[in-house]
Amino acid sequence: MYGDLANKLILEAKRTQQLSQAGFNKQQLPVYQDELVRGILKEVGSLKKNVDYLREQQLTDQDNKVAQCQYVVAMLSMERNKRCLLAYQKMRSEMLDSMVWDNNGMEFSSAISNHPNLSSFDSSVLSHAEQEYLKEYAQLLTELKSGELSEIDLTGMLQPPSDVFIDVRVLKDAGQIETEYGVFNLIKDSQFFVRQSDVERLIQQGYLQKI
Protein backbone atom coordinates (compact mmCIF):
# COMPACT_ATOMS: atom_id res chain seq x y z
CA MET A 1 0.00 0.00 0.00
CA TYR A 2 1.24 3.47 -0.86
CA GLY A 3 2.84 5.21 2.10
CA ASP A 4 3.66 2.10 4.17
CA LEU A 5 7.41 2.43 3.63
CA ALA A 6 7.34 6.14 4.42
CA ASN A 7 5.44 5.38 7.62
CA LYS A 8 8.14 2.89 8.68
CA LEU A 9 10.79 5.54 8.02
CA ILE A 10 9.02 8.10 10.19
CA LEU A 11 8.62 5.56 13.02
CA GLU A 12 12.38 4.95 12.84
CA ALA A 13 13.02 8.70 13.03
CA LYS A 14 10.73 9.05 16.05
CA ARG A 15 12.51 6.19 17.87
CA THR A 16 15.86 7.83 17.20
CA GLN A 17 14.63 11.18 18.53
CA GLN A 18 13.17 9.59 21.65
CA LEU A 19 16.41 7.77 22.44
CA SER A 20 18.40 10.95 21.92
CA GLN A 21 16.09 13.01 24.13
CA ALA A 22 16.33 10.33 26.82
CA GLY A 23 20.11 10.73 26.78
CA PHE A 24 21.01 7.34 25.27
CA ASN A 25 24.30 7.64 23.34
CA LYS A 26 23.94 11.07 21.80
CA GLN A 27 27.23 10.53 19.99
CA GLN A 28 25.86 7.72 17.81
CA LEU A 29 23.19 7.54 15.13
CA PRO A 30 21.39 4.31 14.16
CA VAL A 31 22.16 2.76 10.79
CA TYR A 32 20.94 4.78 7.81
CA GLN A 33 17.81 3.10 6.41
CA ASP A 34 19.12 2.84 2.86
CA GLU A 35 16.76 0.03 1.83
CA LEU A 36 13.70 1.92 3.04
CA VAL A 37 14.81 5.14 1.37
CA ARG A 38 15.44 3.37 -1.94
CA GLY A 39 12.06 1.66 -1.68
CA ILE A 40 10.31 5.00 -1.16
CA LEU A 41 12.15 6.56 -4.10
CA LYS A 42 11.14 3.60 -6.27
CA GLU A 43 7.53 4.06 -5.15
CA VAL A 44 7.68 7.76 -6.03
CA GLY A 45 9.00 6.85 -9.48
CA SER A 46 6.10 4.44 -10.01
CA LEU A 47 3.57 7.05 -8.88
CA LYS A 48 5.08 9.63 -11.21
CA LYS A 49 4.69 7.26 -14.16
CA ASN A 50 1.00 6.88 -13.30
CA VAL A 51 0.57 10.65 -13.07
CA ASP A 52 2.35 11.22 -16.38
CA TYR A 53 0.23 8.55 -18.08
CA LEU A 54 -3.02 10.10 -16.84
CA ARG A 55 -1.87 13.51 -18.06
CA GLU A 56 -0.83 12.20 -21.48
CA GLN A 57 -4.13 10.41 -21.96
CA GLN A 58 -5.99 13.51 -20.77
CA LEU A 59 -7.94 11.40 -18.31
CA THR A 60 -7.97 13.95 -15.51
CA ASP A 61 -10.88 16.03 -16.76
CA GLN A 62 -13.98 16.36 -14.62
CA ASP A 63 -15.95 13.85 -16.71
CA ASN A 64 -13.70 10.96 -15.69
CA LYS A 65 -14.17 10.74 -11.93
CA VAL A 66 -12.20 7.49 -11.50
CA ALA A 67 -9.12 8.77 -13.32
CA GLN A 68 -9.39 12.08 -11.51
CA CYS A 69 -9.40 10.24 -8.17
CA GLN A 70 -6.38 8.16 -9.23
CA TYR A 71 -4.53 11.32 -10.20
CA VAL A 72 -5.21 13.07 -6.87
CA VAL A 73 -4.25 9.99 -4.81
CA ALA A 74 -1.00 9.57 -6.74
CA MET A 75 -0.08 13.25 -6.34
CA LEU A 76 -0.84 13.26 -2.61
CA SER A 77 1.10 10.01 -2.11
CA MET A 78 4.15 11.47 -3.86
CA GLU A 79 3.93 14.62 -1.75
CA ARG A 80 3.67 12.64 1.48
CA ASN A 81 6.61 10.42 0.55
CA LYS A 82 8.67 13.51 -0.22
CA ARG A 83 7.82 15.10 3.14
CA CYS A 84 8.68 11.90 5.03
CA LEU A 85 12.04 11.59 3.27
CA LEU A 86 12.88 15.23 3.99
CA ALA A 87 11.84 14.87 7.64
CA TYR A 88 14.07 11.78 8.05
CA GLN A 89 17.06 13.48 6.43
CA LYS A 90 16.51 16.68 8.44
CA MET A 91 16.39 14.77 11.73
CA ARG A 92 19.67 12.97 11.01
CA SER A 93 21.43 16.11 9.73
CA GLU A 94 20.42 18.03 12.87
CA MET A 95 21.84 15.25 15.06
CA LEU A 96 25.08 15.33 13.07
CA ASP A 97 25.21 19.11 13.49
CA SER A 98 24.83 18.70 17.26
CA MET A 99 27.67 16.16 17.36
CA VAL A 100 29.98 18.57 15.56
CA TRP A 101 29.11 21.48 17.87
CA ASP A 102 29.34 19.32 21.01
CA ASN A 103 32.81 18.21 19.97
CA ASN A 104 34.09 21.70 19.27
CA GLY A 105 33.92 21.45 15.50
CA MET A 106 36.84 19.05 15.18
CA GLU A 107 37.32 16.95 12.06
CA PHE A 108 35.52 13.68 12.76
CA SER A 109 37.59 11.77 10.24
CA SER A 110 40.77 12.38 12.25
CA ALA A 111 39.26 12.68 15.73
CA ILE A 112 37.18 9.51 16.00
CA SER A 113 40.13 7.31 16.90
CA ASN A 114 41.83 9.87 19.16
CA HIS A 115 39.07 11.71 20.99
CA PRO A 116 37.67 9.83 24.03
CA ASN A 117 34.15 11.09 23.48
CA LEU A 118 34.13 9.85 19.88
CA SER A 119 35.68 6.44 20.48
CA SER A 120 32.28 4.76 20.09
CA PHE A 121 31.28 6.71 16.98
CA ASP A 122 30.87 4.44 13.96
CA SER A 123 30.82 6.37 10.71
CA SER A 124 29.73 3.25 8.80
CA VAL A 125 26.15 3.86 10.03
CA LEU A 126 26.04 6.97 7.83
CA SER A 127 25.22 7.10 4.16
CA HIS A 128 27.98 8.26 1.82
CA ALA A 129 26.29 11.65 1.47
CA GLU A 130 26.07 11.97 5.28
CA GLN A 131 29.76 11.15 5.66
CA GLU A 132 30.65 13.90 3.21
CA TYR A 133 28.24 16.32 4.90
CA LEU A 134 29.70 15.57 8.34
CA LYS A 135 33.25 16.08 7.13
CA GLU A 136 32.52 19.37 5.37
CA TYR A 137 30.32 20.73 8.19
CA ALA A 138 33.03 19.96 10.77
CA GLN A 139 35.61 21.66 8.55
CA LEU A 140 33.35 24.69 8.12
CA LEU A 141 32.91 25.10 11.87
CA THR A 142 36.63 24.60 12.48
CA GLU A 143 37.43 27.37 9.99
CA LEU A 144 34.79 29.62 11.56
CA LYS A 145 36.23 29.15 15.04
CA SER A 146 39.81 29.70 13.90
CA GLY A 147 39.05 32.95 12.05
CA GLU A 148 37.93 36.32 13.36
CA LEU A 149 35.74 34.60 15.95
CA SER A 150 38.55 32.50 17.43
CA GLU A 151 38.34 34.26 20.82
CA ILE A 152 34.60 33.58 21.17
CA ASP A 153 33.36 30.21 22.41
CA LEU A 154 30.70 29.53 19.78
CA THR A 155 29.89 26.16 21.34
CA GLY A 156 29.01 27.62 24.75
CA MET A 157 25.48 27.75 26.13
CA LEU A 158 23.36 30.61 24.82
CA GLN A 159 21.75 31.29 28.19
CA PRO A 160 24.01 32.85 30.84
CA PRO A 161 24.43 30.63 33.93
CA SER A 162 22.19 31.47 36.88
CA ASP A 163 24.84 30.18 39.31
CA VAL A 164 28.61 30.46 39.11
CA PHE A 165 29.11 27.18 41.02
CA ILE A 166 26.86 24.14 40.63
CA ASP A 167 26.51 20.58 41.91
CA VAL A 168 27.04 17.91 39.27
CA ARG A 169 26.78 14.13 39.15
CA VAL A 170 29.11 12.07 36.95
CA LEU A 171 27.09 9.92 34.52
CA LYS A 172 30.09 8.09 33.04
CA ASP A 173 33.82 7.97 33.69
CA ALA A 174 35.69 10.89 32.14
CA GLY A 175 39.08 10.75 33.83
CA GLN A 176 40.73 13.74 35.47
CA ILE A 177 40.06 17.37 34.64
CA GLU A 178 42.21 20.23 35.85
CA THR A 179 40.57 23.53 36.81
CA GLU A 180 41.58 26.74 38.52
CA TYR A 181 40.22 25.28 41.75
CA GLY A 182 42.00 21.94 41.58
CA VAL A 183 41.94 18.55 39.90
CA PHE A 184 38.75 16.46 39.80
CA ASN A 185 38.67 12.73 39.10
CA LEU A 186 35.36 12.15 37.32
CA ILE A 187 34.23 8.66 38.31
CA LYS A 188 30.71 7.46 37.55
CA ASP A 189 28.11 8.29 40.24
CA SER A 190 30.45 10.68 42.09
CA GLN A 191 29.31 14.26 42.80
CA PHE A 192 31.19 17.57 42.81
CA PHE A 193 30.61 21.25 43.50
CA VAL A 194 32.34 22.99 40.60
CA ARG A 195 32.38 26.20 38.62
CA GLN A 196 29.85 25.84 35.83
CA SER A 197 32.09 27.31 33.14
CA ASP A 198 34.70 24.60 33.86
CA VAL A 199 32.32 21.72 33.17
CA GLU A 200 29.90 23.23 30.65
CA ARG A 201 31.29 21.18 27.76
CA LEU A 202 31.17 17.95 29.77
CA ILE A 203 27.51 18.61 30.58
CA GLN A 204 26.77 19.14 26.87
CA GLN A 205 28.58 15.91 25.98
CA GLY A 206 26.61 13.87 28.50
CA TYR A 207 29.39 13.10 30.98
CA LEU A 208 27.91 15.22 33.77
CA GLN A 209 24.42 16.08 34.95
CA LYS A 210 23.52 19.23 36.82
CA ILE A 211 21.69 18.46 40.08
Curated annotation (Swiss-Prot):
Species this protein is from: Kluyveromyces lactis (strain ATCC 8585 / CBS 2359 / DSM 70799 / NBRC 1267 / NRRL Y-1140 / WM37)
Subunit structure of this chain's protein: Component of the GINS complex which is a heterotetramer of SLD5, PSF1, PSF2 and PSF3.
Any single Gene Ontology cellular-component annotation: GINS complex
UniProt name for this protein: DNA replication complex GINS protein PSF1
Record keywords, A-Z: DNA replication, Nucleus
Highest taxon listed in the record's lineage: Eukaryota
Localization annotation: Nucleus
Chain's role: The GINS complex plays an essential role in the initiation of DNA replication.
